[in-house]
Amino acid sequence: PLSTWGAYIIGTMGGLFEDEGYALHSGFSGFLAAVPFQFYPMTALIMVLLTVLYRRHIGSMRHYEAYTDEDDSKLEALEEEMPEERETGVSHWALIVTVLSLVVMTLFMMVWNAGFNLGEVLNQDITVPLFFGGLTAFIVALGFAFTARNVHLGEIFKTAALGIGAMAKSAVLILVLAWMVSGAIQDLDAGSHIADAIESVNFSTTVIPVVMFLVAGGMAFATGTSWGAFGILLPIAVPLAVSTDPTMMPVLIAAVLGGAVFGDHSSPVSDTTVLSATGAGAKLHAHFISQLPYALISALIAALAYLVYGLSGMLLLAYAVMAIGLFLYVKLTKAHAA
């Protein structure tokens, strides 16, 4: 929750809960309640660990791994292209202290806003505390930058301006558009209309979680952003849960969030895909093709888990499905020789 991503989701959920008269959760507590149902992120993280431990390289990734193993000069060429590191005299503790300042200040401001009443902390709007936490971390980072060697003052502010500009051109614009769409959807009362349609055709509510997961994934894949999927589908998922089964609220929220993250991970036009490829020094197409099978397998396992939970209402059974799916992933794929 201590991120712009978390703040946006929590703020959106809080407003939707208030509009729908849903009093079981605040935006923050609703966000936390959805964590146990985040089947896709859990599966993806565990799959990363299993892939590393058991060297499960599938699809084009197997080809790229074999290619670099056969010719180490390819890796050496990449290393030569990397920019030369400069000795700045700044300890690695600078990063740790900066991150800690963000967390500590954010938590302090949450407690402050709650009047030091710990029981009310989860009901607070995290947006303002997160702003002060980010501002504090920025000031701390500037302090470390000023003490660094071989780093000029103009370079520091140029880097800060580039970071602000990148956010303004991408994340801020996406947020504004998402809020516009979200407001339009609420004015149209789309969630209630969908709920009425489900009831009129006797559509089983047990499959709603997996449907929301797949729709969010497809939407984020097509648009290249999870933020837009959040803004469009959360205003549908919340009133849908209120109208059909309020106890399904956490799992529906998790399905939307997890599906949007899956689509964002998989999309060739996603900023995360571009940044990952750039950071790894890989071509965008090669990165997209090589990571897609892993994301699809994780999404398939997560979809089955949502389906099983919707049919049974048992979280442990959904976890069992995830465990079986990951076990089959390891058993049915071949290890890549070291």
Regions from the language model: what does each represent?
Residues 37-39, 92, 130-131, 164-172, ...:
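Membrane-interfacial loop-to-helix junctions in multi-pass transporters
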Residues 172-178, 202-240, 244, 249, ...:
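Hydrophobic alpha-helical transmembrane segments of multi-pass integral membrane proteins
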